[in-house]
Amino acid sequence: MPAKQVAFAEHAREKMLRGVNVLADAVKVTLGPKGRNVVLDKSFGAPTITKDGVSVAKEIELADKFENMGAQMVKEVASQASDEAGDGTTTATVLAQAIIREGLKAVIAGMNPMDLKRGIDKSVIVVVEELKKQSKPCKTQKEVAQVGTISANSDDSIGKIIAEAMEKVGNEGVITVEEGSGLANELDVVEGMQFDRGYLSPYFVNNQDKMVAELENPYILLHDKKISSIRDMLPILEQVAKSSRPLLIVAEDVEGEALATLVVNTMRGIIKVAAVKAPGFGDRRKAMLEDMAILTGGRVVSEEIGMKLESTTLADLGQAKKIVIDKENTTMIDGAGQQSEIKARVEQIRRQMEDASSDYDREKLQERVAKLAGGVAVIKVGAGSEMEMKEKKARVEDALHATRAAVEEGIVPGGGVALVRARHALEGFKTANHDQDMGVAIIRRAIEEPLRQIVANAGGEGSVVLNKVVDGKDGYGYNAATDEYGDMFEMGVIDPTKVTRTALQKASSIAGLMITTEAMVTELPKKDDKSGGDMGDMGGGMGGMGGMGGF
């Protein structure tokens, strides 16, 4: 086990605070509409330019081990705020720095760190309740666009396109962000259920201009195994042929004789058929087939529930208004499933989302909800260069998270005003003792900091603006983008309640732990290791390998 170094009391706190300040000072320059960019060096490729707090925080590693521990703990604040609310990372970092700075001053003055932490925790609960009282529901498309615009650094084109996407696919719909090929942002909406499997044979194509297979009012056969023998399928094919309606087959695979027979019958015009592979793998494939069955009002033909392909009837098949299949995707439009069953399935998947342990599983479950409930919208980000594309894509993703948070928990005045307004809830708030009261005072001072920083980044004087805002009421605040005072809701400067709440809770949680730190332990820095210097002799010895040419 390598030797360790230990720092205690003042020395430990001083080093920790230095690390916190380095990271927070780099992150907080990005706050607000007039926040600056930060350039991040990459080990390969061009540098990345960003205004996203968590991206800056993730890049910072300090040489001094003790300082680095302080920086890493504040990095955790930004990461947690990003994970839970998707935005507010810079606000969380600014709040954490302010709480730690004021808290450590109080510890140095002789206050009890544990009581300070208790006071901080109690006052955060009061402030969060006050934020919830200020919160208004985010209902209109205009409000959604305003939230997106603020989060995307006052880029109203991003706010508008996100609001449009949310209106088209609903709050439950999936909105994905991709790199576009042009200069302008584009919105592509897929209604109905789409999955990433195309036709198994190009001979199924019946629209030669678009190279797609279009099936109007088709039956849909869902099977969870491979189909290789046509004999099993003959009974159901005959029933479908009599009905004169097309058929889509979704199975693990359709191959050999079965595929050849389907192609021949389609080309001769005896029956209009298309076959695609089922999406996903393993248990996820079974779940998605079941989703399709519920959406189309059919059943999955599965031996697990005692059903056989040869005994399938038309009543077991799903139906839809239209199906479009291209080389890579299949889209089912207007399935014939019962709305009550679809709703119940969506609720079931939502419960699974709450229990999901990984982000990947949660994302896949969210996609399934969207395919059942709404649709899928793709925002294609346009930019003039690769560097701009990366920066813009990150902003669109941030804005998307913020708008989802706004729809979920509502909106409060932006620009740091909501936190300043929440201060009055702490006036006269008394705790068990003087040291805990000091913890309350620390939060009262810290929640001014986001407003002060936004003003400082805009080139103003924080204290002057703060006093004017404090004298106002409700949504009255300072719009740093236009350098005007007024009602923040009317000016469209709004923040999601969830983002503001999460930023404060995460910042106070980790700051409280850091204030109560009394010792720090880390490995001793390693001396430069010169063990690679003796390898020069190997060049001569390797020459004998030339004889291997005989092979």
Swiss-Prot record:
EC class: isomerase
GO molecular function: ATP binding; ATP-dependent protein folding chaperone; isomerase activity; unfolded protein binding
Organism: Acidithiobacillus ferrooxidans (strain ATCC 23270 / DSM 14882 / CIP 104768 / NCIMB 8455) (Ferrobacillus ferrooxidans (strain ATCC 23270))
Entries under SUPFAM superfamilies matching the protein: GroEL apical domain-like, GroEL equatorial domain-like, GroEL-intermediate domain like
The entry's keywords: ATP-binding, Chaperone, Cytoplasm, Isomerase, Nucleotide-binding
Described function: Together with its co-chaperonin GroES, plays an essential role in assisting protein folding. The GroEL-GroES system forms a nano-cage that allows encapsulation of the non-native substrate proteins and provides a physical environment optimized to promote and accelerate protein folding.
Annotated positions binding ATP: 30-33, 51, 87-91, 415, 479-481, 495
The protein's Enzyme Commission number: 5.6.1.7
InterPro entries from the UniProt entry: Chaperonin_Cpn60_CS, Cpn60/GroEL, Cpn60/GroEL/TCP-1, GroEL-like_apical_dom_sf, GROEL-like_equatorial_sf, TCP-1-like_intermed_sf
Location relative to the cell: Cytoplasm
GO biological process: protein refolding
Record's keyword annotation contains ATP-binding: yes
Catalytic activity from the UniProt record: ATP + H2O + a folded polypeptide = ADP + phosphate + an unfolded polypeptide
Protein name per the record: Chaperonin GroEL
The protein's assembly and partners: Forms a cylinder of 14 subunits composed of two heptameric rings stacked back-to-back. Interacts with the co-chaperonin GroES.
Gene designation: groEL
The keyword Nucleotide-binding is annotated on this UniProt entry: yes
Family: Belongs to the chaperonin (HSP60) family.
UniProt GO cellular component terms: cytoplasm
Family annotation (PROSITE patterns): CHAPERONINS_CPN60
